[in-house]
Amino acid sequence: MAFQGTSRTLTQQSSAATSDDLQKILFSPEAIKKMATECDLGRHHWMRADNAISVRPLVPEVTHGRIASFFKSGYDVGELCSKGYMSVPQVLCAVTRTVSTDAEGSLRIYLADLGDKELSPIDGQCVSLHNHDLPALVSFQPTYDCPMETVGNRKRCFAVVIERHGYIGYTGTTASVCSNWQARFSSKNNNYTHIAAGKTLVLPFNRLAEQTKPSAVARLLKSQLNNIESSQYVLTNAKINQNARSESEELNVESPPAAIGSSSASRSEAFRPQVVNGL
């Protein structure tokens, strides 16, 4: 069935056989693997000192070539109205830090077109995140569809660019970026409303939320104290040392604060229980 020109969807613009061919190109095991390894789709990308600038295309180079060939063959015989366009409604990036909040550094994230040698942000859609701002969600919306063409030796498509700045003294991973998007391909294109890049700061996960009640906190402290006493003072098949027991009992008895530097103060410091989880 020849191109009808009545729909923007690829399925209605070409025969069922050719749309099936395109599905095989996009969702073959090899294509899915390439999307993960070359584009980091849905995977965590680590920002390190030796990888301060990351450019990740939204379509693998091999897949890009096959899709472009598919559209070109349909265009040459008159079945398709163009050589193909790539459309990405939205790119969503989840950014988390992997160092303490006092580390001085930032990330600059933006969407670029590989057809641009300068890799400038598309329509100024660029977000800067300081380390203490993280975690955060970042979103981009391209304002046009990208032609499936080759410019010089570059396969033209959209790409996510991440730049790491600062973090002096931190050579390892300082932030993790997980990007998700859904690329679409059609023989017709469009322009879209300009929407500024979105930046939503996210509250860090409170893993102690279930232990905010006093009873839960008391149970946690009691279990920690019991563990310490057991590990230090319970001896198998032996009589408990009287001195050790008396010092153990001091943990549960409130006493006036001792003078700094006194022997009692140093002894209480030595047997002060370790409290976990910031409690």
Curated annotation (Swiss-Prot):
A Gene Ontology BP annotation from the UniProt entry: transport of virus in host, cell to cell
One of the record's GO cellular component terms: host cell plasmodesma
Species annotation: Cucumber mosaic virus (strain N) (CMV)
Main location class: host cell
Top-rank taxon: Viruses
Keyword Transport annotated: yes
Keyword field contains Transport: yes
Cell location: Host cell junction, Host plasmodesma
Family, similarity comment: Belongs to the cucumovirus movement protein family.
A Pfam family assignment: 3A
Name listed for the protein in its UniProt record: Movement protein
Keywords tagged on the record: Host cell junction, Transport, Viral movement protein
General function of this protein: Transports viral genome to neighboring plant cells directly through plasmosdesmata, without any budding. The movement protein allows efficient cell to cell propagation, by bypassing the host cell wall barrier. Acts by forming a tubular structure at the host plasmodesmata, enlarging it enough to allow free passage of virion capsids.
Extent of Low complexity compositional bias: 254-268
Residue numbers spanned by region Disordered: 246-279
